[in-house]
């Protein structure tokens, strides 16, 4: 039996080895990585900023006797690759796609998933972010607020709405598998820095609070938005680094340091503050004043 228990749900109408089975070749640089017997990750091999728009982020794949739950959908271009990889694991239908947030490299493939019968879930806050984007053509039918629960084939998925990368990030927790999928609350690729999206309501102050909340969950493996999966201790290490960066900015703000001085210090001390993260520096300075 499939169930959705969404106490706060609003109906908004309108390190493991690559999977050993033969993986379909579709021209998309991705691979299946086995996490558990019933849990896999579709990892973008080219985890670089230049390839985000073309190939999207990671996807979590949870297998049940009644169907498949995905976390994130990459983008429209990668749809056939995602479906082929799921089909290499099971002939059960993709029943649910949980979107960790509204950005196209994670949510862009959702319309095609809906077209093949999947129900799409996202937080109401990030649904609203999606709806106000220029020239928006589609938004998910269902949104939730705060907490939600999916049960399908006797397996549970718990959804936690938190603020960090955006104002309505979703962390998807799989208790039986001891896995949490965090979207862009967590990135582990050396080429894609962890950043906050301020235009979509993100916050570095709330990011650490949200990660601390997630760390209270009983998990062994975290699936990031980009990059390889990591252990819980590695999440702690990343959290501590980003808090150290934040507090360094706070201190230098008080010392009346310039943006360039702060940026130079962050690059030197943390190897952070260049490339995509450079745009976070002035916004972080403003948030921490």
Question: Which role fits each region the language model picked out?
Answer:
Residues 7-15:
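Bacterial N-terminal signal peptides
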Residues 34-85, 172-173, 178-183:
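Conserved beta-strand hairpin/beta-sheet module of binuclear metal-dependent hydrolase folds
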Residues 15, 19-24, 215-218, 229-289:
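Accessory terminal helices/loops
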Residues 1-4:
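Positively charged n-region of N-terminal signal peptides that target proteins for export
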Residues 38, 62, 72, 86, ...:
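Divalent metal-coordination and catalytic microenvironments
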């Amino acid at each position: 039996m499939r169930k959705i228990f969404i106490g706060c749900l609003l109906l908004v109408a309108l390190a493991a080895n690559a999977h050993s089975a033969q993986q379909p070749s579709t021209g998309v640089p991705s691979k299946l990585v086995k996490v558990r017997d019933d849990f896999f990750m579709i990892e973008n091999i080219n985890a670089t900023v230049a390839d985000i728009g073309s190939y999207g982020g990671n996807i979590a794949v949870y297998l049940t006797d009644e169907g498949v739950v995905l976390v994130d959908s990459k983008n429209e271009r990668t749809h056939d690759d995602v479906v082929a990889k799921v089909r290499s694991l099971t002939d059960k239908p993709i029943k649910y796609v949980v979107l960790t947030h509204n950005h196209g490299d994670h949510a862009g493939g959702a319309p095609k998933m809906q077209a093949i019968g999947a129900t799409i879930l996202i937080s109401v806050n990030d649904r609203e972010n999606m709806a106000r984007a220029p020239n928006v053509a589609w938004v998910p039918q269902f949104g939730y607020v705060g907490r939600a629960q999916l049960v399908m084939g006797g397996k549970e998925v718990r959804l936690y709405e938190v603020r960090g990368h955006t104002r309505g990030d979703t962390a998807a927790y799989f208790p039986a598998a001891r896995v949490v999928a965090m979207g862009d609350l967590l990135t582990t690729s050396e080429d894609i820095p962890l950043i906050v999206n301020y235009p979509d309501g993100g916050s570095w102050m709330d990011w650490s609070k949200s990660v601390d909340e997630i760390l209270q969950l009983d998990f062994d493996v975290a699936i990031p938005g980009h990059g390889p999966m990591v252990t819980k201790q590695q999440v702690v290490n990343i959290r501590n680094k980003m808090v150290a960066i934040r507090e360094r900015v706070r201190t230098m703000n008080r010392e009346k340091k310039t943006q360039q001085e702060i940026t130079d210090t962050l690059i030197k001390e943390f190897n952070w503050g260049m490339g995509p993260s450079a745009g976070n520096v002035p916004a972080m300075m403003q948030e921490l004043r």
